[in-house]
């Protein structure tokens, strides 16, 4: 039987986790494989030590590792290990942490010789299809390279690199079996990793600093409301039985609360709170449109969720530069007054060093938000996330970005005898 290891790793050094969410992305892939590829035995990994042990005990035929800003170097380390332990294995990487520009994407694979394939875009079906194609060529990565593989970057037998751009997202999300309801994620009710749920995918906004601001994600698609309710209930029951101290629920949507069904889902969470005492904290990025719906969602969560209104900047020129529109501050102040009167909490966020921002305009925004009575204000430095328009070479040149690198908080560790660090690129100056 073909073995596939699916790893969405988080640094775990001295018990400190670099990411405290369950590995939902690769769990989707396993759920599809379990249904569609019965001849494949797949396992999901979140913790590096467990993956290391499994790879030494039984090196997989295929290793698939997720690539995010918090685990790229960590994934690279295990890609190299896979080739050391079993040179004929196929090593696949996927995830949003890769540049938008085709030339830089091709260069990425060239710079990482342990990788055979990079999956672009959503991998729920692309990754299982890749394994299916591999089975058809008897597991030969060389013969795999002779095929035309959509949404992938991969090596041809002659050493050249093939590039097939992402195909448009078209399949219904409910075609993906739920990794919660199928039990794929049951082993991660361990009291360390918080449950993570998607109710939809995609974003109607075009913010250039965000991966979901790109055209690939411009259509919002939904998991059925019935399925999401069942997932919430499934999680609540197991949290109560297995790890009652875990009070957190993380919702992965980019604009939770903006749609009418979100209000209904929050009502269901409120009912679960009464029955199971969970969740006590809902970590969700609330939408910046339809504030009346967002407020209703916050209210129905019995105080477990805050109104998260990340303005990023209050300067109109900056907002145009990053293709973003904010709710007017006066309207936001009215929302805040309404929420405070009901005992609800609010939080906002600014980003330092956005294109066009000046020291004066940034300080002015800080003062306005403080004066508006925000309960909590976060001030971040602009990170050049791979996969965003802001990170492209053209944008860098347009706004004369000067950037530097630093280790991301909690994203380092020692694995075997190797020290591994994951870093971020931040902007330290612009032309303003």
PLM features: residue spans?
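Conserved N-terminal glycine/acidic-rich loop preference
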Residues: 7, 11, 20, 59-70, ...
């Amino acid at each position: 039987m073909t073995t596939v290891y699916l790893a969405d790793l988080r640094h775990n050094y001295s018990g400190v986790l670099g990411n405290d969410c369950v590995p939902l992305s690769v769990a989707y892939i396993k759920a599809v494989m379990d249904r569609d590829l019965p001849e494949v035995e797949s396992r999901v990994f979140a913790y590096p030590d467990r993956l290391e042990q499994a790879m030494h005990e039984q090196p997989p035929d295929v290793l698939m590792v997720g690539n995010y800003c918090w685990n790229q170097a960590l994934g690279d380390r295990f890609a190299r290990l896979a080739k050391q332990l079993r040179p004929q294995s196929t090593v696949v990487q996927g995830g949003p942490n890769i540049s938008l520009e085709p030339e830089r994407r091709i260069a990425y694979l060239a710079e990482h010789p342990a990788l055979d394939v990079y999956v672009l875009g959503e991998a729920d079906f692309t990754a299982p299809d890749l394994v299916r194609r591999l089975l058809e060529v008897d597991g030969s990565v060389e013969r795999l390279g002779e095929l035309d593989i959509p949404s992938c970057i991969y090596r041809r037998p002659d050493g050249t690199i093939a590039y097939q751009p992402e195909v448009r997202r078209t399949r219904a999300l409910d075609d993906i079996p739920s990794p919660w309801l199928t039990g794929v994620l049951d082993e991660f009710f361990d009291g360390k990793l918080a449950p993570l749920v998607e109710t939809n995918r995609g974003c109607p906004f075009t913010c250039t600093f965000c991966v979901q601001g790109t055209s690939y994600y411009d259509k919002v698609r939904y998991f059925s409301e019935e399925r999401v309710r069942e997932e919430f209930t499934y999680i609540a029951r197991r949290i109560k039985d297995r790890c009652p101290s875990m009070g957190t629920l993380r919702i992965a949507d980019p604009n939770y609360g903006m749609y009418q069904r979100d209000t209904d889902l929050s009502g269901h969470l409120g009912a679960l709170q009464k029955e199971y005492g969970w969740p006590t904290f809902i970590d969700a990025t609330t939408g910046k449109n339809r504030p009346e719906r967002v407020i209703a969602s916050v209210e129905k969560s019995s105080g477990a969720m805050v109104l998260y209104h990340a303005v990023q900047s209050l300067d109109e020129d900056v907002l145009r530069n990053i293709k973003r529109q904010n709710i007017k501050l006066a309207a936001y102040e009215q929302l805040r007054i309404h929420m405070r009167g009901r005992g609800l909490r609010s939080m906002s966020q600014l980003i330092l060093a956005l294109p066009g921002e000046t020291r004066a305009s940034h300080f002015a925004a800080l003062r306005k938000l403080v004066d508006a009575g925000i309960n909590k204000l976060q001030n971040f430095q602009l990170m050049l996330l791979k996969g965003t328009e802001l990170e492209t070479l053209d944008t860098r040149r347009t706004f004369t970005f000067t950037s530097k690198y630093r280790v991301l908080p909690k994203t380092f560790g020692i694995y075997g005898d190797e020290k591994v660090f994951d870093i971020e690129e931040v902007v330290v100056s612009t032309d303003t």
